[in-house]
Every structure is written in C-alpha cells, then in structure tokens.
Amino acid sequence: KPNSHHFFNIKNKSIFTHIKLNIYPDGGIARIRIYGSMKILKNFTGKVLNLTSVLYGATPIACNNEHFGRAENILAPGIGKNMGDGWETRRSRGKNFDWLIIKCAAAGKIKKIQIDTHHFKGNYPDKCSIQAALINKKISGKAIVNNSKKWKLLLNKVKLRAHQKHNFKNNLMKDKKVNYIKINIFPDGGISRIRVFGKAE
C-alpha cells in the first residue's frame, strides 16, 4: 500500500549477517527495518570489554519508565548527541526511584563502572546505585524483574553531577561473576550512557 508501514513476522530462526531486498517490478521504499535478537559470534572470553555495550550484544530487559528517552540509548557507543539520545524518566514527586535492567553481552567479573550524564544539566539523577546477578537458567522477564529486588549491590548509592563522566571501581563484588545489571536512579532523571567494564568469562 502507498504511504504506509508494512510489518511481516518471520518464522525462520537461522542467524543472518546480510539481507537482500528485492522489489517487483520497481518503485520506491522509504525505509527497511529488520528487528531481531543479536547473536555475537566472536568469542570474548578472557578479554576486558564494556559488558553493557550494544555492539557486543548487551540488551535492555525492562525498565519502569522511559518517558523522555529510550532505555536502549544508554547502551550505545560514543557520546550522546543530546538529551534525547540518552535514557530519561519523568519527574517523580514521591519517594520512589526509577530503574533499568540490562542483560550483559557476556558473563564476567566487573572491574570498573562509568555513568555518563552528558547533556543532562538540570535533570540528571541526584544519586544512583547498581545491583548485579548471575542468571544461568532461562527465566521470564517478569521473573527477572521480581528477583532483581534481592540482587547484590555492585555499587552503593553514590552522588551524581551534571554533564560529566563518573568512574567507580568495583569494591563490592570483585570476585563475583555477573551477567545482569540493574541501575537504580534516585529519584528520577536522565543518563546518557552506562559502561560496565569487566573480564568476560
């Protein structure tokens, strides 16, 4: 149909690296978007890398709010273009906090954490904390969210500042292998990027 979005479900479960689009007999297409789960074929075992990078296969599992900016943005490489290129939640007037759960690209032992509030000057979170867990069995996203309340602290609640990178060492779970990260922001606000560096195992 003209001037329309067309969605098609694909049942093929194979892994692909290239896509070829054929049109019959001719004509114009504005955009093509292929949605799916990334499968990283490279073996990162023994290497120190950003375990929360989308380039290596990290993915957001759930968050409680993404009113002004999508959660997946904070896994992107490089510096955010603007506030809209980060994760930002709506203003909270209560005592609640906002959170985001990330499945790491690989399981690993965490060495360093970086929270980047680039572009967020009057709407960055006052504080944040990070929890982590190692989940080897396949469970639902809902179960992960419920269980995350009991995850161990990877980073105690720390103060954040506007428009800068915050670097923290892992002093709480040095010898613990993890593959899920939960970032809690107090009470709300925006974060441009999160980078969790660790040795993949």
Locate the predicted segments by residue:
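Trp- and acidic/polar-enriched beta-sheet ligand-binding modules for extracellular glycan
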Residues: 1-99, 108-109, 118-201
